[in-house]
Structure formats: C-alpha cells, structure tokens
Amino acid sequence: MANGVIPPPGGPSPLPQVRVPLEEPPLGPDVEEEDDDLGKTLAVSRFGDLISKTPAWDPEKPSRSYSERDFEFHRHTSHHTHHPLSARLPPPHKLRRLPPTSARHARRKRKKEKTSAPPSEGTPPIQEEGGAGAEEEEEEEEEEEGESEAEPVEPPPPGPPQKAKFSIGSDEDDSPGLSIKAPCAKALPSVGLPSDQSPQRSGSSPSPRARASRISTEKSRPWSPSASYDLRERLCPGSALGNPGPEQRVPTDEAEAQMLGSADLDDMKSHRLEDNPGVRRHLVKKPSRIQGGRGSPSGLAPILRRKKKKKKLDRRPHEVFVELNELMLDRSQEPHWRETARWIKFEEDVEEETERWGKPHVASLSFRSLLELRRTIAQGAALLDLEQTTLPGIAHLVVETMIVSDQIRPEDRASVLRTLLLKHSHPNDDKDSGFFPRNPSSSSVNSVLGNHHPTPSHGPDGAVPTMADDLGEPAPLWPHDPDAKEKPLHMPGGDGHRGKSLKLLEKIPEDAEATVVLVGSVPFLEQPAAAFVRLSEAVLLESVLEVPVPVRFLFVMLGPSHTSTDYHELGRSIATLMSDKLFHEAAYQADDRQDLLGAISEFLDGSIVIPPSEVEGRDLLRSVAAFQRELLRKRREREQTKVEMTTRGGYVAPGKELSLEMGGSEATSEDDPLQRTGSVFGGLVRDVKRRYPHYPSDLRDALHSQCVAAVLFIYFAALSPAITFGGLLGEKTEGLMGVSELIVSTAVLGVLFSLLGAQPLLVVGFSGPLLVFEEAFFKFCRAQDLEYLTGRVWVGLWLVVFVLALVAAEGSFLVRYISPFTQEIFAFLISLIFIYETFHKLYKVFTEHPLLPFYPPEEALEPGLELNSSALPPTEGPPGPRNQPNTALLSLILMLGTFLIAFFLRKFRNSRFLGGKARRVIGDFGIPISILVMVLVDYSITDTYTQKLTVPTGLSVTSPHKRTWFIPPLGSARPFPPWMMVAAAVPALLVLILIFMETQITALIVSQKARRLLKGSGFHLDLLLIGSLGGLCGLFGLPWLTAATVRSVTHVNALTVMRTAIAPGDKPQIQEVREQRVTGVLIASLVGLSIVMGAVLRRIPLAVLFGIFLYMGVTSLSGIQLSQRLLLIFMPAKHHPEQPYVTKVKTWRMHLFTFIQLGCIALLWVVKSTVASLAFPFLLLLTVPLRRCLLPRLFQDRELQALDSEDAEPNFDEDGQDEYNELHMPV
C-alpha cells in the first residue's frame, strides 16, 4: 500500500486501475499540536456520515442501466472526489511527534471499542481474509520497520468512452484455455462462510471495509433477470496488474451474483478502482517518523530494503520424482486416489494381482495419448508459479480456474473439489499398517478445509480459501452413494514415510521435487477438465505421496467415463514427460503454455514409433535400442548447440548458469598428470606438488569402518598370489627365491610405496610377466654359468639408472601410445603361459607318480619321510618319494577342485542368488575359500602322498644353505665377470619395459574419470619409487615387484562408496572413493606377518597352487576382446553379437585383425620357448609401433576405432561383471 494503490475488495475490475497519490506534507519546524485533531479527522463517525449521505434507492422508480460512459462521467464530476486523504489532514505545523508505544496501543484499543458492532444478519458480503487484524498487523509492521514513502502516480487521462474488455492471463486464440501466472493466481479469491457459520470472537470488531461491504449489501436491490454478469471479470483483483495486496480475496460465485442486483454489481465494479474518500483508507504516516529528508539516502534505504524482500522464484531444475494416482473404488466402494505407477528415472508399475512393484522399465507410450496430452495442455488450464502451500488451497484455485475456463460448470465446484481432496493410498499402506490400519476421514469438505485454515494472523501466504455454504447443496460425488459428504478425505499429518518407503527414499536425490499426477473418471462431469500447476516453491503435501518429497508440479485430469479418452495412458504420458530430463527442465523454465507445448514437440522429435506388428523375440528389438541411442546423441548435440549459441550471444537461459559454471571450473581445474612440462624432472615435481598436500587427509580419511573391511578383504587377495607365485618361483629358481622372499618383498615395498607413493591405492605385488622374466633370466645365467642372484644385483642397479633417466625425461607420457591392441596380446600371452604351466606341472606329477598296476610296499620309501608330509626341495638332501599310488589322481582332484570352486564362486558373484553384498563377499573371497577347502580335503586323506609348499621356519630364506639375505655384488662363490656388469644393462632395460607397462597402465586404469578420484595421481613419482625399490631388492635377493592390475582395481573398488540415491533400473554411480594410505600400509604389514604362519603354509599342496594358476589364466581370458573375436571365427555371422567391432567392421576384416594379433602372440611364444626368451619384453614393445604405423595402412580409422578402442568403464552393478572382465591386463 506504500505506493498509494487502494486494494479492491475482490475479483477483477472491468475498468482500468487508478492509482491515487498520497500527498505527504513537508516537515515543519515545530510539531507540538495535540493529536486530537487527527483523531477527529479520521473518526468513524465521519466515515459513517460520508456513507450515510448516499441517497436511498426507490424501488418504485424504473431502474436505469449504467454504461461505461456514465461511470466515466461520474468519476470526473464533483460528486466523485479524487482528493487524497492527506488533503483533509491538519497543517504539518500542528502535528506533533508520536506518543510512546504504550500510548499508541491504548489509543488503538479505545478505537476498537468504539468501532465494534454486532455481525450482520443479511447476505454475506465478499470477504477477504485480511480484515482489521491484518490491517493492524501491517500498521504495526510499518511502525516497527521505521519509514515508508508513497510514490505518487498520476491517474490516466480521460479518454473517449470505450467498451471495457476483461481478460486474465494469456488466452490463446485457438483454444479456450486459461493460463494464469503468479500475480493473478496468488490473489485468486474464495467464497467466505456466511455470518451465521463463521466463528465470531467476543470483543472483535469488523474492519471498516467489512462494514462498508455490509452496508452496501443491505442496500442491494433485487436482481434483474435481464442483466448479464460475467464471472471472468471478477476473478483477479485489480491490484494484480500492479502491486497485489497481501490479502487473498474470495471470488464471487454464481449464487452471490444471483442474489445481488445489477445496479449493485455495477456499483461494485465502479468502486473497485475508485478513490472513495474516507472509506477503507490506511492511515498516512506522520512526517515526524521519517528520520531523513524526502531526498535523503537514509530515508530511501528502508524503502529499498522493503522492495528487495520480494522472493525470487526458483527456476533451477531439480531431480524429479513422479507419482501417478488414479481415482478408484476401494473394497467398501468408496472413492480414493490409488497410486498405480511411479517414476524416478524409469517407470515402475503396481501389479494388480499381487499389489507389489514390478521391475523398472522404459515407459512405452502410445502416440495417440501424446497427441491427446498436447491438446489437453493447449485447451486446459495452466497455473504457473502458484503461491499456495496446502493441498486444499491448490485444489480450490484449480477448481476456480476450471470454472473460468469453461471446463466445468459452477454447480460442479463442490464435487470436483471433494474429488481432489480424497484420501491417497499406496501399495505399501496395507503391508505396513499392521492390525490397525489408519484411515483418516472427515465429515465434510468444510471441516477438512477448516482444519487447514490458519488464522489471519499467520499472514497471507498461509491463508487457505474456504468454500461458502450459500452455494446450495452440492450434487453427490457418486450417484449410488448419497453419503458422499462422509468420504475419507485428505488429511495432513499422516503416519509419515513407512519402513518400506525408507528404501525408496534413499534412492531419490536429496534435492528432488515431486510431480503428482491425478487422473480419473467421475460421473458428474460432461467433458474432460485438466489443469497443469507449477507451484512457486516446492511444498510438502503430507499423506499425498508415498515418500515425504516436496511437490512442485501437479497435473489434474478428470472427465466422464463415456469418452474415448484413456485417462491411465494420458497420466502415464505426462508422468513420462516429467521424468524426461529435457522436458522437466523446460517445465521449470516455462513462462507460458506455449513453452510447454514446444517441449512436447521436442520430446516427440526424439521418440520412436514402433509399427503395430507382433514381436516374437527380443532379437527383433535390438535395432530399436541402437536407433534410440542415435536419436539421443543427436538430441544432445542439438542441446549443446543451443547452449553454445546462447552463451556466445551473451545470454544464458535460466538454470544453465550452474551447469556452465561447473563445466567451466572442471575444464579449468583439470590437471593432466601426463602432460610434459619441458623441464628436467618437471613431471616429478608436479606430482609431488599435486599429491603431497593431501597427506593429512590421507590419514584422516582412513577412520572409517569401510577401510577395515577393505583391509581384511585385500589381505587375502594379496596373500593368495604371493603364496602361489612364491611356490612357482621356488620351482623355477630351484629354491633361490620362494615364498619367504616374495612375502618379505611384498611387505617392505608395499609399506614404503603406500607411505611415499602418489597413488597409494595401487597394490604392489608380483605378476605373471615378471615370473616369466625371472625364469628366462635364470635359464640364461645357468647357460652362461653365472651366479643368478649376483646378476640380479647388477640388473637392479642398471634399473635404477634407467628409471631416473626416464623420469627426468618425463617419459611416462609414452603410456598413451599403448593401446588395447598391445594390452590384449600381453594378457593373452600371459594367460596361455599360466594354463600351459599348470598342465605341464600336472604332467610332471603323473610322470613321477604314474598309474601302475602294482606299487612297491611302503618299506621302499625313503627313511624319515611320511606319506602326507612336506617334501624337501630336489636339491636338499635325498629326493622325494616316487611312484606313489594315488598321488597323481589326488593331485588332479586337488587342482581341478581348487579351480572349479574358485571359478564357480566367481560365477556365483555375478548370479541372482542372495543379495548383492553377500554375493560380492563370497565371490571376492573365492580363492581363499577354494584353497582352504582343498587343504582340508588333502589333510583328511592321510594315506596318500602329495607334494607340499616349501616354507622355512621363521624369518629365513627359502634355501639357507645356498644364500643369505644380502647378496654380494662382486660374487659369492666366484668373482662376477666385469663384462656381465656392463651387459646387465640389457636385461635391466627389458625388465624396465615390463615394470613400465604394468605400472603405468594400472595407474591409468585406476585414475579414470569414471572412478572419481579427487586427489590426483602421479605417474612419474610412482614409477620412480617402484624402479628404485626394485634396485634395492636385487641387493637383498628379493623379487622385483610392480603394480598388480587386478589387485589394485579390487582395492579401489573396495574403497568406493556408491550413491544410494540411484533410480531403480539405473546403473550405479560413484559417490566418492576413500583415498588414503593406511589401508595399503596395513595390507602390506599383514602380508609380512603371514611369514610366521609357516606351519600352516607348509600344509598347502602344490597341486592346489596349480589350480589357482589355472584359475588366473582362464579368468584373464574372459575380459579380453581378442578371445571373443577368436570364437567368432567358428560361429556363423547370424549369431554374432551386436558389438561395434561386429556391426561397424566387415567380417573378413575383423578376422584379419584377429589373425594379426594371433601372429604376434605366436611369435612371442616362440621367442619365449627358445634361448632368446629373455628378449620377449622387447618384442612385446615392438607391437606399439606396429599398431601406430602399419595397421593404419591396412584398416580405416573407423574400423580401428571399433576394433581397438578403450571403451571399458568400471562396472559396479551387483549383477554385473567383476574386475577380470573389465581389464585387458595380465594377472
């Protein structure tokens, strides 16, 4: 009211709004006059005199119809005073300052007592929910706030009389729909209760405006049947065109219009925008309250602050949760809203027979339902940015809008309102309610609304419209039920979200806003009626949704049952649209109905129409998925183009600022660890600066129970390969290095790397390629009559030199050139070696212990040896027993049993039995479980000999009589030749190739963007640590280690925290990864402490280790694309899978690529089997230039992209694949 606009009593006015300036007298030097003059000037008696002077209407005289020309003439004559109220105030010098606050309250109380009057018994006037209480509140608020100023606005100049036109919103020419925006929708009125039903407090007095309305009602004349009255003219208050008042007003309904005469209606129209002197005027603030002058900035500051208090609408898109409710009859034939489907991202339907939720699926819509939905939105009501906080208030405004847009009849107002306020039920209600289900109900619509109706002191935002009883008795909601008033209605404060809903609530994002879709058929409507509602802010409507999610959108569709409209399909259509990302973003940013219609057209452009033919297999629908992906790709490109065009033009659409800022920050803050700086050790310095500042958080982040579980799991995952490779390494090196050396090396290097490394999540361990190299170098030294351990010392020293040179030159960037072509060859070769070595060892067992028809007696055994005991190494003392009965068969059983148990536990991990977490635990511990089971089987068979693992007692080397913990660089038994000291640079370069490939590729896999590691990584620092520590390992006779791919990925997965707010059917997403150093230190320490379990380790048969070796070889082949393409050679083309390397490449060219890889593998196998086996890492390195230089001449870039692309992403689905399927690296 600060700008001088007098609020009209209700509905829109047919005349333009007149703003009356409030003249404020200038400040006088002395204001000591008594305040009685002001009281006399504004006395109620003076208002009564002004009103009572109105001449009474003589019913005997013929009535006259007034036109707009008469109203215009009346406004500009002396009978219609336009002087502001401030002109009647005393001169400024007679005013004095305000008395104290207590005196003002006492004077206001006396004024209340003077103006109190009993309620009128006549026809109820048009009430507004502000009243005197609201006026006093506003007056008190202005007094407490300090100062206000009215901006004078000149009234519009008089023009020629024209016929007034009334319109609300933006009516389309081609549709009778109504689109009401926030200013008008907020002020939508409601019909007040009659005076005999409205509660009156003792001592309360009506406001002057209510008294004036009552006097005007008492003077009302009989209604003329010839007079016409349009309800649209009174829907919005006139102040909606400018600054709307704080009160919500009640619209005049048909019954009240019939009770009033045409002259009264015209009189109401005329006076809504007039300046009626002395009637319902706010007090002009005294000039003494203004601290500064009229032009002083201090006086304008509070006014500017008040103008800034207007709340800005939130147009930022949120995550969505959609719920479809249909109008149904329960067992007692009472109508209620029943939830039949829901959307978080995909559709979930309630199965009618079992009342349980089905599996999430992509919603399939009929094209006709989409067209009907588009027509419904074009012709229905669209209420955008509606300022209501309760369901009754929203429902009332929706009903009134439907009446104004001629969708429903005025006499159906009560029935539609009762339908919208019916009780909501959900599938989980019956399951969770127990023996005492809660069924809140109410006696009538008025009682429900009354429970939600706050007092006027709560402010205009909380006011809820009420429904007048003078509408007459409403028609029954259902024809067969006369007691429709007693239906269960929506009641707030339900029993909250239930236990079943807690799991669903976890899957909904925190900032999600809900969409409620209400569809159904009712018997009392003649045509469908629809409304699309967007609230100005999300509100929590209790007992409406299955979960407590704030509601932002509502869609209502009611209509008769005899039409051809399928309300269920239409509700599914709007719900699917709201779950679509682009459409619900457009719904947030829509300014009118046309924006919604345009978004529907965009949705139709990206939709697929399937012809009405019978589909008898899923294979027939494969092309649909590919076509849909293509449409989505084009849709994203169009959206990206629009965003770029808007940003280039300097305009950013609402809701795009945040995404652009996030994208820009990511682009600017992204730091490529493989980018070369051009300076010596520049990459190493960057790694240290990037990673070491996070060292304190690396210790704090380990304080979580998930880290403890990861330590226990990865400990067994690291101990099993250490025992397996240690036993095989002892076999290959004739006991010079075995389990003891490998356990010590894993512990020491693991602790140092976890404390100093740039990526402490990498697990350092022994691998198959290093085992192959150790065997090749051992054979080379035996052939050249050289000491194997002394040669390893010089190889280690040269390894340190080469690593320093490589890190100084920032050579880690070369890992980008190692494509899956080389990785698959590497992994396939190592897997073949594992499988070959397993059966080769089994063949040796059958050779030493053949199946004979007759075996010698037990006395033939060597003295001092038991049947089922640990045998000494072949070089230690007497050889082990030979020709033992059942040894070969038991070894075969132990090997196959270990392999099958571990393999099927891995399959069980990816099955559908039990829960996802239970399957993961069982599958991840498959190797330890299989080892334990087979050891128990061997231990239970006491009369059959099996060769056991050789483990010394305590902290000792495997062969104490052959070596010590320190290896002399110049030789132990004889001097080491000097030429070999220099020539050791060649095997050092070869072992560097293996360490570089495995370490850098593993670090590259772990640091993928999809894994969401935030603290960064350091390729140069990690390579320097592993290479330097490998050089020290040579001095102590310990095996070289590298970053183990499978164990490192398993470690990262164990520390990954998945998001719980994932839509059912959507793929899991990573929330965070607990990047810390403590788990690596504890895992390495526990592996080191395992050396004290020598008595237990000595019980493990070597055949069990052969089974683990076979398991690692077979499982490594499953994730290699080469093995899948190899099988396609023997498969008809019609059975080929729908993979890019099949659909985008001709079959014979795909086979050519496969044969090239097989040729490389065959060449490497031949080299490995000869005396030149030491050179196989160099030949492996040659596959990199082969891929970069030769293959582009044979294949097109499009074919190479399909055949040699790194498109594997981490899979965290409970039913998905494990680490072996994701990696192209050897174990």
From Swiss-Prot:
Q: Does the keyword Cell wall biogenesis/degradation apply?
A: no
Its gene name is Slc4a3
Transmembrane spans: 708-730, 736-773, 793-815, 825-846, 888-905, 921-941, 975-997, 1023-1044, 1078-1123, 1150-1186
Q: Which organism is it from?
A: Rattus norvegicus (Rat)
Q: Name one GO molecular function term.
A: bicarbonate transmembrane transporter activity
Stretches the record annotates as Disordered: 1-255, 286-312, 428-497
What taxonomic lineage is listed for the species of origin? Answer: Eukaryota, Metazoa, Chordata, Craniata, Vertebrata
* InterPro entries in the cross-refs: Anion_exchange (IPR001717), Anion_exchange_3 (IPR002979), Anion_exchange_CS (IPR018241), Band3_cytoplasmic_dom (IPR013769), HCO3_transpt-like_TM_dom (IPR011531), HCO3_transpt_euk (IPR003020), PTrfase/Anion_transptr (IPR016152)
Arranged from A to Z, the UniProt key words for this protein are: Anion exchange, Antiport, Cell membrane, Glycoprotein, Ion transport, Lipoprotein, Membrane, Methylation, Palmitate, Phosphoprotein, Transmembrane, Transmembrane helix, Transport
Q: Which PROSITE patterns match?
A: ANION_EXCHANGER_1, ANION_EXCHANGER_2
Give residue numbers for the modification (Phosphoserine). S167, S170, S175, S198
Protein's recorded name: Anion exchange protein 3
